[in-house]
Amino acid sequence: MSIDSLPPLREVIERHDLMPKKSLGQNFLFDLNLTSKIARQAGDLRDQPVIEVGPGPGGLTRALLAQGAYVTAIERDDRCLEALAEIAAHYPGRLRIIAGDALEQDFTALFPEGPKPRIVANLPYNVGTQLLLNWLLVEPWPPFYSSMTLMFQREVAERIVAKPDSDHYGRLGVLAGWRTQAKIAFDVPPQAFTPPPKVMSSVVHIVPRETPLPCRAEALGQITQAAFGQRRKMLRQSLKSIGGAALLEKMGIDGTRRAETLSVEEFVALANACLP
């Protein structure tokens, strides 16, 4: 059934009293041209499984279904479930709704067989970074998903794609650069949302590397957390709790350098040396 046969989103929100909750990091998208653009960025979705986190009233959900996807939508706001159920009725067998917190979801169990899902979502701003970290550090690798097309605040998007010696380079950039190839696809202005956030947003497209540099995810997660937790300090100080100066000397890395100057490859080498 056509997306045009569904009632307008503003009507759905009014009927179900779905004003966005700041406590849940909700900013709803009404522009169907924009939601369709996000869905297209994920590639050809015909008969492909898609995971959507935080669908809210279902603006992006509609676009994904209209492009032929099989959508699994995870929503913790019970107020939105009835509106999503109405969409499911228009697309029989194509929308699975899971009521719950995405941070507690076992994503690997959602698709035990068949093609890997794509993750496509306008992520709630208050949990978006943590969800991405979880998906970057998931084991085993290659991961349970084939790609991610995600909306973030522009500042977070810049951290994901940042390179060494740049203002935005940090733990997120190291982990994303290690295991994936990420790019900012396009920006979304505040006025596209209800309520409009105070900052620009960006859609990021992320594709997993089949064979990233060998390293334990837990080890790299720990060493980047230590290094960037005190990013203005020299490495011999910020890494003091895990060997500091001796470890850096062993690896031939100048202990007076700061975390933002190290390449992904250097972080991987440090992680392999200190946390085998």
Swiss-Prot record:
Catalytic activity: adenosine(1518)/adenosine(1519) in 16S rRNA + 4 S-adenosyl-L-methionine = N(6)-dimethyladenosine(1518)/N(6)-dimethyladenosine(1519) in 16S rRNA + 4 S-adenosyl-L-homocysteine + 4 H(+)
EC number: 2.1.1.182
Subcellular localization(s) per the UniProt record: Cytoplasm
Cytoplasm is among the record's keywords: yes
Root EC class: transferase
Binding site for S-adenosyl-L-methionine: N27, L29, G54, E75, D101, N122
Family statement drawn from the similarity comment of this UniProt entry: Belongs to the class I-like SAM-binding methyltransferase superfamily. rRNA adenine N(6)-methyltransferase family. RsmA subfamily.
Family annotation (PANTHER family): DIMETHYLADENOSINE TRANSFERASE, DIMETHYLADENOSINE TRANSFERASE-RELATED
Protein name: Ribosomal RNA small subunit methyltransferase A
Species per Swiss-Prot/TrEMBL record: Brucella abortus biovar 1 (strain 9-941)
